[in-house]
């Protein structure tokens, strides 16, 4: 399989690829390196937890709740792509927000400490982001020796939302 993960999802796919290399053909990691990071998305997690799905009736209602915590509309739109309608006709998150909140600090605060993935790997970095720094390439090379690094112009950490054209082009070129 080909795997793609952004940020925390990037850490997850790196860990999976190292743990189960026989299951991964190509790996794409968006705007995160295999290093430890200080936790700094607590505001977003708090916003996601603040949505009361017994009270909201529409995606717009959810966006209004998130807007109380998150000033960037494109981030809100990106996050609400993770909504779905349950069988009892209520909105909910596709992910377990309580587990994410509980484990988030442990996961981001730790580097990917073990192993190596020998398959082709694409790291995508937002040109305006500081998540992947030049000194991170040593770790990337050690654990993902067949890596390439592509910078996505005019994009910060939310590169797939800020510049989807260049993001998708880089992904498609890598996969073909």
Residue ranges, per PLM feature:
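Alpha/beta-hydrolase fold nucleophile elbow
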Residues: 1-7
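Catalytic active-site module of serine/aspartate enzymes centered on a nucleophile-bearing elbow/loop
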Residues: 147-176
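Short alpha-helical segment within the catalytic ATP-binding CA
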Residues: 7, 11-12, 158
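Core-facing hydrophobic residues within beta-strands of well-ordered domains
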Residues: 24, 36, 144-147, 155
